[in-house]
Amino acid sequence: MPMVHDTEGMVNIGKATQGQGFVHTITGFTPKQKLEEQKDLLVAYNEGEKSAFVGGTVPLNFRHALAQIEVNAKNAKPSSVRVEVVGIKLVNLGTKADLALPSSTTADRVVADPAANTNKTLALDSWTGLQGKDTPATAYYKNKAASDNVLILTDQFQSIMFGADRFMVIPQALTPWDGSTSTTGAYLAVLCRISNKSGDNYSVIYPQPKAADN
């Protein structure tokens, strides 16, 4: 019995295909663009006769189907430069794919010999038909909410996620952006303001101030 689950309950995700009464594939799964609207996706499989399970209860050991990304940053020169972060983006990742659900029992992660347990995670090739790469308009993003403070970077790494949530994206191999004028290749964008610091005085150097700015 393949099962799909998110952190808030059973859900209909994409389009499910069936064979011999079992759901085998979720097609067209697409994570939300806004971080705060994304959900985790868990899958599990078990089978057997009812009489084999104590009290008729079937144990299900769920696996995370998505990749979790947390972004951390620091400022190498906090004494002379101030960096204020107000948003982040993951750009040009694939945004839609099909997931083949497990067809064998997802075993318990807690085993006497963890090295012997090869069934802890879903294989990367469980996801196929990746679409949407190199499309900047569909970037995953998180912006500072009105109630959030601007994040001022220090010389220690800190999360710039504006909360406990993490990006939940389709696992995939990425080709990095090459730093040219090309619009292809994956990259992380940080929306920030950078200022030179002299005592208690600051002068903005990025983005370049306009004449109308005070």
Predicted regions and their residues:
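Extracytoplasmic cysteine-anchoring/structural motifs
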Residues: 1-214
